[in-house]
Amino acid sequence: MRFLKSLFLISFLCSFLWSNGQSPIQLAQQHYDAGRYDQCIAAASVAIGEEAGAEAYFCRANAHHKLGHFSEALEDYDRARIHGFSDDELYLHRGICKISLMMYEAARIDLMQHLELKPEEAPTYYWLATLEYMNMENKASLRYLEETLAIDSAYADAYYLRAANMAEMNRNNLALEDFQLALEYNPKLLRAKFNAAVLLIGMGQFENAIELLSELQLENPDFISEVLYYRGEALYYMHDMEGACTDWKESAQLGDRDAQQNLKKVCGEKGKLKSKKRTYFAF
C-alpha cells in the first residue's frame, strides 16, 4: 500500500516539476520543511539518480525517520554516505536513527564522531545522554545533560530527560522541578505535566495529581487513555471507587489493558489494585 501511494505521488510530481521548473531536491526539501514527509519521500525518490543523489538520499532518510520508518531511514543514511554526502549532520541523524533501532553501540560511534566535529552543539550531548539513559546508566546520562544545558539552558527535552533520570533514581522532588522546567520551556510538552502527576501519585499527593490530570484531560493529548488510567488510580487511593471505575472504564474503552484489568479485578471482583509500571521518558 505504501508502494502504490509513493508511485502515485512520484507520477504526480514528475508532471508538476515539468510545469514549474523546480528541481526535485528543492521540492523535497520544501515538503520536508513543511512537515509533508510522504511528499518529501516521493520528491526525493525522483531526485535520486540525478546529480543531487547523495543529498536526496539524506533528505529521504530524514523524512523516513520522521515517519518512524527507522530501517528505511538507516538504509538511506548509509546510501547518502556511500554516494558522497559529506555534511557532518549525517553522523548526528544516523546516530539518532540507530538509537531508535536500539543499535546503541553503533549509535555511540556516530554520535562521538559528530561530537568530535561539532563539540559545541547541544543536541549531540543530549542524544548521548539519551543513549546512556537507554542503557540504564543514569549517572552517565546526567553528565551529558550537564553539558547540554551548559550550552543551551533552554533545552526543554534535556530537562525532561534529566527529570526521567531523577525519577528513576528516586530523587522525586528534583524530578518534579525538571518536569516543570521542561513544560515552561516547551508548553506543548504535555508528557512533562503527565509524568509530574504520576510522580505525585507515588508521593501520596493524590489531590495535586488529580488536578494536573484533569487539566490534561481538557487538553486532550494523544495519550488520554493513560491520563484517565492514572486519574482512576489516584481516585482509588482516595477511596473514590465510583470515580476510579468510571475513569478506568473510559480508559479501557480507549484500549488501555491495565484499565481493562482493573475493571475486572478491582471494580468487578473487588480485588486489590496492581499499579501500572511507571515509565518517564515517553514523548
Residue ranges and their predicted role:
Residues 18-55, 59, 66-68, 75, ...:
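N-terminal leader/linker segments that initiate helical-solenoid repeat arrays
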Residues 54-55, 87-89, 122-123, 156-157, ...:
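Helix-start (N-cap) detector for alpha-helical repeat units in TPR-like alpha-solenoids
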Residues 157, 161-168, 177, 190-207, ...:
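Alpha-helical adaptor scaffolds
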Residues 35-42, 67-79, 101-113, 135-147, ...:
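Structural signature of tandem alpha-helical TPR/SEL1-like repeats
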Residues 49-50, 83, 117, 151, ...:
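Structural marker of alpha-solenoid helical repeat scaffolds
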Residues 229, 233-283:
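Terminal, low-structured helical/coil segments at or just beyond the last alpha-helical repeat
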